């Protein structure tokens, strides 16, 4: 086998090498250490087999020098069983893209001189069967290649000048000597060693054959390979201790009874179970045969490449002779599986792995395939379990009583809290919601109230009667405290130099869903999105949920009708209606100068929400020859009309609110027209005062326009005594009617049916102002807060009482 010139390693393979190189999906070979002694591998006992193979590898790989060679990896993608029905099939051929000129395939060291015994062993030794052949001339079995220059041969001829001597000898052969199929692009040494390829004259006389010789006498079909694998199993265990395949644990072993090759006998209706022989103990193998070296197997129409083996849909044929050992082995394997053998239709190697399933046995991997085209079912995303947010009655709420008791004992905390600001992601038209939420988060009593309510798990509270409270408790818990910095000396309007690091923005989808849970009119498509209306929706919703809980603590006989929605004073018609119908909650009140009036108050129960935002207005109707009629009406926001040209500031709008109003055309029961006057005053001021500048005016034609005018508003607002009701003027001190601005909601744009909302909030930790536009958070100075432009106008003003700061 060795010659004075450089010799190619890719010559002869033992049966275990062939399985590792061409059967296993991914193989590696660790060559054994160099051995100085040489014993020819002939028909010997299994005890000597390991030493013989040991030396054979050492001689071929190491040579005389005994130098270590690097770890070499080989592999294929698919395995095809040989069957007599595929003898003349022209669908497939095998070629190689391994480069035999690579350094790891060429022996650079000189070989030792041949002896007569060595020459005999080299010429007649069969590395696959580990035995000596009867003749140096190969037998008549072989696979013919339809085109000797096709595949890799055609590509390699383009670089013929760069190839070593004898490289193209596998394309030539003696016409009367049958040649064998190429294995990795090398000629069979048993057939070519007798012919010197170094003699150019002799090489020119050799005609080019239609078939190409192959390097080693590899099995002609897969059954032969299994037959050889089953024989001499005990010897194989010792030989393969040094040959390991990547991925298989060392303790994995294969028994002969578990290896089977079972072709289908039912045509396309039955699946084909193919046993892919795994390496014996001490080997590694990949678990997923459907993927080779990180690449998914391609469709049969495309060429498949894996570690140097290329599968082309070209003309190919198998040997016509089948050994008797192969037939007997195949029948034995079929008997073990309980399935009869038949001629399966020709299919590509890749099709065997399209529906691969893992085997229950760790030793043999089975691949089950049907001839019908594989239908890939679309991946259905996992259905996420959504928490049912539809409110249930308080009687079905397991923690309703506990919740109600907590609300009874809660005490409002007005201490400022420094929170790390976070933007809100807006993936829809939610700017009016995001702007309102940022203002509520900046309200200390609102934040402390929600933080005092515990967060219940789904197990503790499988259903809820307070989805709105739960959502706002969750919202406040999204924000974390930030240490309060020392108070900086800053004059009003001075530029803030400090910087702040906001937290990561988030999307409060649970808040957005409340609109559909309560079927609010704000969720109607195409409806005007109004920040003030949304604020009323929130405050009324929270108030009603707390009210329902508080009812649980009242005795059954004390249940009374409760007005759940504080609304602004509607008008004189409602007052007159109440006068006609009468009310149980009315009393006569003597005012200044001994003037008496009948006062009516709607039934109203306090909740923590009303304790923060709730105030009362007193509406008095003056009529000739009658006592004054007064009505107390709760409110969450003060509606300020700014349409008049005289109104330029917030103070002007407040004075206009309490101005006396005359009503024309009012008649009594006797159909007599009388003059009526109406005046509204502030009876009770809330801790948090929200002023609504009514910029959207409805026209007689039914349209709506935005009032684009600048209304000046101060940072510190003092409510004049003239705005208070006569009975409370002396009771409310200056500190209780002085407020400080902490949030402003702006409306951007000139249209009343569109636009954008942003918010400016006061940050106690920064001791300055932040401008929040959905996800954007930036520091601004106080001058930018009170300054308005045509494009951006103030819409909602949030004030806190200074005596509670």
Curated annotation (Swiss-Prot):
Gene Ontology MF terms: cysteine-type deubiquitinase activity; cysteine-type endopeptidase activity; p53 binding; transmembrane transporter binding
Principal cellular location given in the protein's record: cytoplasm
InterPro entries, sorted: Papain-like_cys_pep_sf, Peptidase_C19, Peptidase_C19_UCH, USP_CS, USP_dom
Region (Disordered): 136-173, 284-305, 573-600
UniProt-annotated catalytic positions: 431 (nucleophile), 756 (proton acceptor)
Domain USP: 422-802
Identification of the protein by name: Ubiquitin carboxyl-terminal hydrolase 10-B
Gene giving rise to this polypeptide: usp10-b
């Amino acid at each position: 086998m060795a010659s004075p010139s450089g010799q190619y390693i890719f010559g002869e393979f033992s049966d275990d090498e062939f399985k590792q190189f061409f059967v296993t999906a991914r193989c590696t070979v660790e060559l054994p250490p160099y051995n100085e002694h040489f014993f020819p591998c002939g028909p010997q006992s299994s005890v000597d087999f390991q030493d013989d193979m040991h030396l054979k590898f050492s001689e071929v790989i190491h040579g005389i020098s005994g130098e270590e060679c690097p770890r070499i990896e080989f592999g294929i993608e698919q395995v095809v069983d040989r069957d007599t029905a595929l003898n003349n099939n022209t669908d497939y051929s095998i070629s190689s893209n391994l480069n035999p000129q690579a350094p790891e395939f060429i022996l650079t060291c000189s070989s030792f001189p041949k002896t007569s015994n060595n020459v005999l062993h080299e010429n007649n030794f069969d590395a696959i069967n580990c035995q000596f052949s009867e003749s140096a001339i190969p037998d008549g079995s072989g696979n013919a290649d339809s085109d000797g220059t096709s595949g890799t041969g055609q590509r390699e001829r383009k670089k013929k000048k760069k190839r070593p001597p004898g490289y193209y000898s596998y394309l030539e052969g003696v016409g009367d000597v049958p040649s064998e199929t190429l294995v990795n692009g090398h000629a069979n040494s048993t057939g070519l060693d007798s012919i010197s390829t170094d003699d150019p004259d002799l090489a020119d006389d050799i005609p080019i054959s239609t078939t190409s010789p192959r390097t080693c006498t590899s099995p002609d079909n897969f059954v032969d390979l299994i037959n050889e694998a089953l024989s001499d199993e005990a010897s194989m265990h010792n030989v393969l201790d040094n040959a390991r395949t990547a991925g298989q644990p060392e303790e994995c072993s294969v028994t002969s009874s578990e290896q089977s090759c079972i072709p289908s006998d039912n045509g396309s209706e039955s699946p084909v179970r193919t046993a892919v022989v795994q390496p014996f103990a001490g080997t590694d193998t990949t678990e997923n045969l459907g993927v080779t070296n990180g690449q998914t197997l391609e469709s049969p129409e495309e060429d498949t490449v894996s570690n140097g083996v290329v599968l082309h849909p070209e003309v190919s044929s198998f040997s016509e002779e089948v050994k008797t050992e192969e037939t007997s082995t195949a029948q034995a394997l079929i008997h073990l599986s309980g399935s009869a053998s038949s001629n399966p239709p020709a299919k590509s190697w890749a099709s065997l792995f399209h529906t691969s399933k893992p085997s229950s046995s760790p030793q043999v991997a089975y691949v089950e395939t049907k001839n019908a085209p594989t239908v890939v079912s679309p991946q259905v995303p996992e259905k996420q379990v959504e928490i049912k947010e539809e409110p249930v009655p308080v009687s079905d709420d397991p923690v309703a009583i506990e919740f109600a008791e907590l609300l009874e004992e809660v005490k409002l905390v007005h201490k400022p809290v420094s929170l790390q600001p976070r933007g809100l992601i807006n993936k829809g038209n939610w700017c009016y919601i995001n702007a309102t939420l940022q203002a509520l988060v900046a309200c200390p009593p609102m934040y402390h109230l929600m933080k005092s309510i515990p967060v219940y798990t789904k197990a503790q509270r499988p259903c809820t009667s307070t989805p709105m409270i739960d959502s706002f408790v969750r919202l406040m818990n999204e924000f974390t405290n930030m240490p309060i910095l020392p108070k900086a000396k800053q004059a009003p309007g001075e530029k803030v130099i400090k910087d702040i690091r906001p937290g990561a923005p988030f999307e409060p989808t649970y808040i957005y869903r409340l609109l559909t849970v309560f079927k609010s009119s704000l969720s109607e498509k195409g409806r005007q999105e109004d920040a003030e209306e949304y604020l009323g929706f929130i405050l009324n919703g929270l108030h009603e949920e707390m009210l329902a809980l508080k009812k649980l603590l009242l005795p059954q006989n004390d249940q009374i009708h409760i007005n759940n929605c504080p609304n602004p004073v509607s008008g004189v018609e409602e007052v007159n209606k109440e006068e006609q119908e009468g009310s149980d909650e009315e009393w006569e009140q003597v005012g200044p100068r001994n003037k008496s009036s009948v006062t009516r108050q709607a039934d109203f129960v306090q909740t923590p929400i009303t304790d923060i935002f709730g105030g009362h207005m007193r509406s008095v109707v003056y009529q000739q020859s009658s006592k004054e009629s007064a009505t107390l009406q709760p409110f969450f926001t003060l509606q300020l009309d700014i349409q008049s040209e005289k109104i330029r500031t917030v103070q002007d709008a407040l004075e206009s609110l309490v101005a006396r109003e005359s009503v024309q055309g009012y008649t009594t029961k006797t159909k007599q027209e009388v003059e009526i006057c109406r005046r509204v005053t502030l009876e009770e001021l809330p801790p948090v005062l929200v002023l609504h500048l009514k910029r959207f005016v409805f026209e007689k034609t039914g349209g709506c326009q935005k009032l684009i005018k600048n209304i000046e508003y101060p940072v510190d607002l003092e409510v004049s005594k003239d705005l208070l009701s006569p009975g409370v003027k002396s009771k409310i001190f200056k500190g209780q009617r002085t407020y400080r601005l902490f949030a402003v909601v702006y409306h951007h744009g000139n249209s009343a049916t569109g636009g954008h909302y942003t918010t400016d909030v006061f940050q106690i930790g920064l001791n300055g102002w932040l401008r929040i536009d959905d996800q954007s958070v930036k520091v601004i100075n106080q001058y930018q807060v009170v300054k308005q432009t045509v494009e951006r106008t103030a819409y909602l003003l949030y004030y806190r009482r200074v005596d509670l700061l």
